Amino acid sequence: MLQPKRTKFRKMQKGRIRGEAKGGSDLTFGTYGLKALQPERVTARQIEAARRAMTRHMKRQGRVWIRIFPDTPVTSKPVEVRMGKGKGSVDFWACKVKPGRVMFEIDGVSEPIAREALRLAAMKLPVKTRTVVREDW
């Protein structure tokens, strides 16, 4: 599972995901990619599930790049605990994804296999997505 080795602070405020992605909106490594169309918090487990779905469908051929990293700690309080008494402990790690962000890239496989692999990955994610293809070849 993806998570940072060390962070400056243990816990983070919730915040909001506003605006479009400033960077990471173009394909950099692969020929095919999966682009987010709405703002959402994607967890490390969801990223790993999407990666597994893609690599299984591609039968270990080609290459997959993960362009997002879960660097936001999400806290939760235990079940049946009253309000107050401080912020809960870190439960999982997540990545705040803005619209326009390329989350995964694929290369080294044919177009039908790549599109199906990205479709399977999109089903594991809580974000509406679009498959993008590099045009400058």
Curated annotation (Swiss-Prot):
Alphabetical UniProt keywords: Ribonucleoprotein, Ribosomal protein, RNA-binding, rRNA-binding, tRNA-binding
Keyword Ribosomal protein: yes
Transmembrane feature ranges: none
BP GO annotations: translation
Keyword rRNA-binding included in the entry's annotation: yes
A GO cellular component entry from the record: cytosolic large ribosomal subunit
PANTHER family: 50S/60S RIBOSOMAL PROTEIN L16 (PTHR12220), LARGE RIBOSOMAL SUBUNIT PROTEIN UL16M (PTHR12220:SF13)
Family: Belongs to the universal ribosomal protein uL16 family.
Role according to the record: Binds 23S rRNA and is also seen to make contacts with the A and possibly P site tRNAs.
Protein name: Large ribosomal subunit protein uL16
Organism this protein belongs to: Jannaschia sp. (strain CCS1)
Gene that this sequence comes from: rplP
